[in-house]
Swiss-Prot record:
Primary gene name: dtdA
EC number, as in UniProt: 3.1.1.96
Cofactor note: Binds 2 Zn(2+) ions per subunit.
Subunit structure: Monomer.
InterPro entries: Deacylase_DtdA_archaea, DtdA
Reactions this protein catalyses: a D-aminoacyl-tRNA + H2O = a tRNA + a D-alpha-amino acid + H(+); glycyl-tRNA(Ala) + H2O = tRNA(Ala) + glycine + H(+)
Organism: Pyrobaculum islandicum (strain DSM 4184 / JCM 9189 / GEO3)
Family according to the record: Belongs to the DtdA deacylase family.
Protein name: D-aminoacyl-tRNA deacylase
Length: 252
């Protein structure tokens, strides 16, 4: 059901593969190797995580993909991050229970100077029929090569995949910052967060509809940052969400 994606051009992925070794080779398809980590398939790709486009291969092994990747940011700091990928207005399928469970586990395992963050939906790939979750270590080369940090990431992923994930209220956020501010209810287990539409996106009804539809479980709650979503789009979005029975929590 779960499939891990590691990219050989990515330093965090390379260390991750070393940490979880041995990963016996199952088969090769072109420039892609299929390996095995305990009971989970590992797709090893000779490229960048954001360039992976063989969703068909992932779908042949599972429904929920976890991409191991480095994280970069303008003002770098030691950080563990999770998010759903998507290059707006198109996005991947988001898996709120899985992404939020990994986030909670990373936050539990994080050690100084590392902190944890839930990011808004951004960058490729865009999936159509399997969910995608990025799990990252950042934010400079020093952290990407930090074996202890990657071991912590691997521990978090393995812990979640070997657990019975308890679902909470599935939610999305509209108009939040890139580094999500509504993580307290996620950490408390009150909700599972899927797509987060950041305020720098041109937020329209179509963008919200696309994101709403691309979740593994129907969204029951939406957190709307009013000041970052202008009318008439805001009114259209509220009307759409209400028509789907979604509880709307407004902020700002």
């Amino acid at each position: 059901m779960y499939v891990i994606v590691a990219s050989l051009n990515d330093p965090v992925s390379r260390i991750f593969l070393d940490v979880i070794a041995p990963t016996p080779l199952v088969k090769t398809e072109g420039n892609i190797e299929i390996r095995k980590f305990v009971d989970f398939p590992v797709v090893v790709y000779r490229g960048e995580p954001t360039d992976f486009s063989r969703e068909d291969i992932l779908a042949s092994f599972g429904k929920y993909a976890i991409f191991i990747s480095r994280h970069e940011m303008a003002n770098p700091r030691p950080l563990f991050t999770v998010h759903t990928p998507g290059s707006w207005p198109d996005v991947s399928i988001s898996n709120p229970p899985l992404t939020s469970s990994i986030f909670r586990t990373l936050c539990k395992l994080a050690y100084e100077p590392y902190t944890c963050a839930f990011e808004a939906t951004h960058h490729t790939p865009n999936t159509s029929y399997i969910s995608a979750t990025f799990v990252e270590v950042g934010s400079t080369e020093n952290e990407w090569k930090d074996r202890k940090a990657v071991e912590t990431l691997a521990q978090a992923v393995e812990e979640v995949l070997n657990s019975q994930i308890k679902p909470n209220t599935p939610a999305m956020a509209i108009g939040d910052l890139h580094y999500v501010t509504v993580t307290d209810p996620v950490l408390k287990g009150e909700l599972d967060l899927g797509h987060v539409i950041p305020k720098y996106v041109d937020i329209s009804l179509q963008v919200v509809q696309n994101a709403y539809l691309k979740h593994t479980t129907p969204i029951e709650r939406a957190i709307l940052f009013k000041k970052n979503v202008k009318n008439p789009a805001r009114s259209e979005i509220i009307e759409f969400l209400k028509s789907r029975g979604v509880e709307i929590i407004t902020k700002g």
